[in-house]
Amino acid sequence: MAGSPSRAAGRRLQLPLLSFLQGATAVLFAVFVRYNHKTDAALWHRGNHSNADNEFYFRYPSFQDVHAMVFVGFGFLMVFLQRYGFSSVGFTFLLAAFALQWSTLVQGFLHSFHGGHIHVGVESMINADFCAGAVLISFGAVLGKTGPAQLLLMALLEVVLFGINEFVLLHLLGVRDAGGSMTIHTFGAYFGLVLSQVLYRPQLEKSKHRQGLYHSDLFAMIGTIFLWIFWPSFNAALTSLGAGQHRTALNTYYSLAASTLGTFALSALVGEDGRLDMVHIQNAALAGRVVVGTSSEMMLTPFGALAAGFLAGTVSTLGYKFFTPILESKFKVQDTCGVHNLHGMPGVLGVLLGVLVAGLATHEAYGDGLESVFPLIAEGQRSATSQAMYQLFGLFVTLMFASVGGGLGGLLLKLPFLDSPPDSQCYEDQVHWQAPGATLSPLPTPAFQVPGEHEDKAQRPLRVEEADTQA
Amino acid sequence: MAGSPSRAAGRRLQLPLLSFLQGATAVLFAVFVRYNHKTDAALWHRGNHSNADNEFYFRYPSFQDVHAMVFVGFGFLMVFLQRYGFSSVGFTFLLAAFALQWSTLVQGFLHSFHGGHIHVGVESMINADFCAGAVLISFGAVLGKTGPAQLLLMALLEVVLFGINEFVLLHLLGVRDAGGSMTIHTFGAYFGLVLSQVLYRPQLEKSKHRQGLYHSDLFAMIGTIFLWIFWPSFNAALTSLGAGQHRTALNTYYSLAASTLGTFALSALVGEDGRLDMVHIQNAALAGRVVVGTSSEMMLTPFGALAAGFLAGTVSTLGYKFFTPILESKFKVQDTCGVHNLHGMPGVLGVLLGVLVAGLATHEAYGDGLESVFPLIAEGQRSATSQAMYQLFGLFVTLMFASVGGGLGGLLLKLPFLDSPPDSQCYEDQVHWQAPGATLSPLPTPAFQVPGEHEDKAQRPLRVEEADTQA
Amino acid sequence: MAGSPSRAAGRRLQLPLLSFLQGATAVLFAVFVRYNHKTDAALWHRGNHSNADNEFYFRYPSFQDVHAMVFVGFGFLMVFLQRYGFSSVGFTFLLAAFALQWSTLVQGFLHSFHGGHIHVGVESMINADFCAGAVLISFGAVLGKTGPAQLLLMALLEVVLFGINEFVLLHLLGVRDAGGSMTIHTFGAYFGLVLSQVLYRPQLEKSKHRQGLYHSDLFAMIGTIFLWIFWPSFNAALTSLGAGQHRTALNTYYSLAASTLGTFALSALVGEDGRLDMVHIQNAALAGRVVVGTSSEMMLTPFGALAAGFLAGTVSTLGYKFFTPILESKFKVQDTCGVHNLHGMPGVLGVLLGVLVAGLATHEAYGDGLESVFPLIAEGQRSATSQAMYQLFGLFVTLMFASVGGGLGGLLLKLPFLDSPPDSQCYEDQVHWQAPGATLSPLPTPAFQVPGEHEDKAQRPLRVEEADTQA
């Protein structure tokens, strides 16, 4: 019970434990983390560089867009719940701020551990934000049904598995996945979905009526649009400099535009009375950038980007309409934000598209650029076909890590002392947030109501007339 | 009737037709659109460039700002309507996503069609977003009175005329218009205004009372501020590299600051009891960047930018206060967002300012920079005076294209099967969007109401007086 | 009285006076302000530069982030007040637009006045925005209790003192303060706090109940998040190119992440029933970037950044919980936004951290980079210890300028003709803004309330318990 001493004590003790988590992280930073040669005052000036050569200028603008997506985009996208806005934005803030520190360590140990130290710079900032993004995708699958302590434990585990999966794919298998269709979207989605399945709450049906407030949906659109506009930077942030980043951004731009049209088309087709559903627009329109996550750095061609984006938008919309209910009824997965439709299916499609485009790679098409997109093919160690096979194999590895990890995570989150909110408190901010005496929330009334059709039908129209006649 | 089977069927059929539109666009992309030499893996590496030379790094950060303005800025600026927020943001999203694809083709055929192909890169992304901006300006003039199918038809036509007008001005007449006072603001505004005139609805007066909700106005301010802060990037996005972009951003920055002060000054001067009007702040403060759209790349001088911005802010504010009512009563133009005040008049002023500044151009003032700002003058093909005359002529060409196009568009949009919303459903989301059982909207109550006094309508007129007399 | 002819006349006259302020500024611009050699068409092309060398490309992306923080971040952060949102965003807009022009002149005369002219470019844009930021910090201390004319007078004075203080610190004392812990945060905070003390309103207690509306807090989170994500750019905007900007952004990034965790930990620890307080999250989480404002360009080490950020987050949270009430009761300072917790204390901590890190500077740690971070030490004019002493002395100078200036400002703002809002109208938009007949505001009801239970206040305390016991 939210107000009972025991729970209060539980809450009072759990988040403060963050201090120890932060303390431990700080100690590890002290021991292992150092500036890299593009960040360190002495090392940078030792080499005889022009300042324009500093990677900062090639990657930082993209990083800032990614940073905005992680904190503004993911945070507000989840504000669509009527009385869970504080938690959606607040826990996104907390989770991402923790995940980016923790993944700086995990990814550092796996990717850039030299001479006993992790060397950090703008690339590690981008990689850490990417990992935080995967954690937030999983968060979307359990949104409203988990407390902050549970979420932090989830992040603690997921960041480690994310790093290992990424290491296996990129370094051991030589898989290409610049925009993270595999490492971020597919991994984050299925980790969260399996975890949500383990935490299945049979009595939660009713919670549905707590979703959606007119202005909450407008806040959510802030998240949608910021994710949408900056996604070209997300996919391009870590691709090869020059034409690589240029092409990646361009492909993503076209793919997103097409998925938006596909979403509107399908949403109207399947909507009641042919009306549009805001849930589709908020989410499915974003599927276009997931589907090109792997292939946007490749010679996908502008046409390929449009076709892939349109396909992703339609599939994602159909998923929200028809598959989400099945997911809950048949598979016992309560996918609060529909991450399966937004990240899961489009992610898998994106991997398959990557398999196709990689398999079609030729020296003619890439010229000397082959070295930067498919180094192993350029060096003659692999044929395009075998690269494609490795890409496909990467999908299975990712699904394996995600499922096992999500299942394990679900069991951990069931630990009794973790203060999981009771069914009656799910999707409610009040269990986690103080309501200062004067904090107010809009009075719920039916959507699109014409003033006057509220309780007292007779009086309101009058009042409006009055207001008008005064004017 | 919104819910009638016929209309429902109409809606259900129209938006899905988007799929064919998208299919046709995709086919045209497949046939004609190719990566340019800065985007293509093989072509880029063939030339022996340093990655820092890739245009991506000079223009992409500005592109991202433009992209944010188009989707966040225009979208939320139009959320000021009380129950039309879904449509304002949603249709902005749809229209812009379609327009940028379509204009990539149209502009490509006209501007960068070589060897049977359109070559795309960051410049074409910026140009496409610019064209989408013009379409959204026109959207502002018919906001709330048109359905998505009508809007898409409008975009289909407007994008073509935008491209032709732009081609005539920039390529045939050698007009300079980096920030689009002519090609974007003047064209978009008058195209939309004439179109709105053709669609005049004599019975729509009352709809006014549907405008304005406290939080809707705050959402609109999100749009205003994002448009305001990023406009220096908009004007600078396509100007010459180096000092050109630098100067353009600086001029726009000063002009915007001055137009903001001018708007507050005039809004208080003409406001009832000297109070400020949020509509003025949301819109007129932005006029400063329209007025320097043409001249911001020129040697306008910081003083010139301030003076122009201040003038634009005052003119725009007076337009909202005094001219908009006349526009509806006398000219039968129902300009929902006041695009005439925000884009029309300031756009024309901007052209005239461009005429003046171009006419004053000298080799002394521009030095070797003359080549990049006024190539025809630098090459001795034109005198500054003749360049000024061409600039002025460009205005008439633009007004001609905009008026004829807007009139034609208005007739097309009257086609009966296009599902235009009935007067009673204008400015209402419900005709276009599903209202899931739990979607809620705030209960309308008078502005600035003191809590607790909301039940009794009778006292409302009084109450405000009381509140005042307490003071 | 808001509605009385006298007040109305007062308002109607005051803001229009802005025109003269703008006119005077414009004249000064005409006489003194010129493009610098990186912005002027002739000067830039005279030197034989590659366009990539133009400072625009190194600093403009950071400038845009700073610009977004000033107008979006500060503006929306202050929307947390229930019925003061128009004024929070609107006056932020007005103040910043004036301050950046005025400070371009003041800073220009003090920093870049050569040959009778002020030379402007992207650096002056950044400096002007920084100064506007300091003015907005002071605004936060008097938010809701001052009219626009008073605020403009405050800005007029503060910008001058800001420029002088900055000149004394950076040019006379050789203090390093890239991110402005001293010049921006400490100065802005104490200037505003002393000013607020002079304007103390003993009867204002009750106004507290006007704070906080559910959606207002969500709007405020928009401000919080945009400030949070872009602060690395703020601190890095003016640091030395290359590794300097790179390192500054990285340090700020880590510090912010740690302060977020510290804030959540402490907020839960001190919150009633261990619940989180949105006020802490909105504000204290940002303290992390204030505390590294001075030292983020130095070799702070990633660990140092984490430790400093965590400390700042905890101290700031405790300030909101325990010190703000004392500040009002004992020191008669009504700090509306808690700028003492967000900018004051963290700012002073930041200065002390800078003293420490500067004192530890060695040639080994900085190598040839020492020249760009501590030129006076590199040139042998100072020892690290004496540099540290100068840093510390800079704090006292800043506090002196801020207190004297704030006191003086407070007396000026008391001038009777300045139309200060009466206590009953504090935190109310209606005194400053028109309420068009149809402008509506959400009906206030208790936070997290279950729909339908809003009428009877009696059950409200109970209700929460019930909800709990169901669990």
Swiss-Prot record, chains A, B, C:
A motif (Basolateral sorting signal) lies at residues 427-430. Residues 34-60, 107-123, 170-177, 239-249, 302, 366-391 are extracellular. Residues 1-13, 82-85, 145-148, 201-217, 271-280, 324-344, 413-471 are cytoplasmic. It is found in: Cell membrane; Basolateral cell membrane. One of its GO terms (cellular component) is spectrin-associated cytoskeleton. Glycans are attached at N48. InterPro entries: Ammonium/urea_transptr, NH4_transpt_AmtB-like_dom, RhesusRHD. The chain crosses the membrane at residues 14-33, 61-81, 86-106, 124-144, 149-169, 178-200, 218-238, 250-270, 281-301, 303-323, 345-365, 392-412. Its main location: membrane. N-glycosylated. GO terms for biological process: ammonium homeostasis; ammonium transmembrane transport. GO terms for molecular function: ammonium channel activity; carbon dioxide transmembrane transporter activity. It catalyses: NH4(+)(in) = NH4(+)(out); methylamine(out) = methylamine(in); CO2(out) = CO2(in). It is a multi-pass membrane protein. Residues 452-471 have a biased composition (Basic and acidic residues). It comes from the Eukaryota. Coiled coil: none annotated. Residues 414-422 are annotated as: Interaction with ANK3. Gene3D superfamilies: Ammonium transporter AmtB like domains. Pfam families: Ammonium_transp. The keyword rRNA-binding does not apply. Interacts (via C-terminus) with ANK2 and ANK3; required for targeting to the basolateral membrane. Belongs to the ammonium transporter (TC 2.A.49) family. Rh subfamily. Ammonium transporter involved in the maintenance of acid-base homeostasis. Transports ammonium and its related derivative methylammonium across the basolateral plasma membrane of epithelial cells likely contributing to renal transepithelial ammonia transport and ammonia metabolism. May transport either NH4(+) or NH3 ammonia species predominantly mediating an electrogenic NH4(+) transport. May act as a CO2 channel providing for renal acid secretion. This is Ammonium transporter Rh type B. The gene is RHBG.
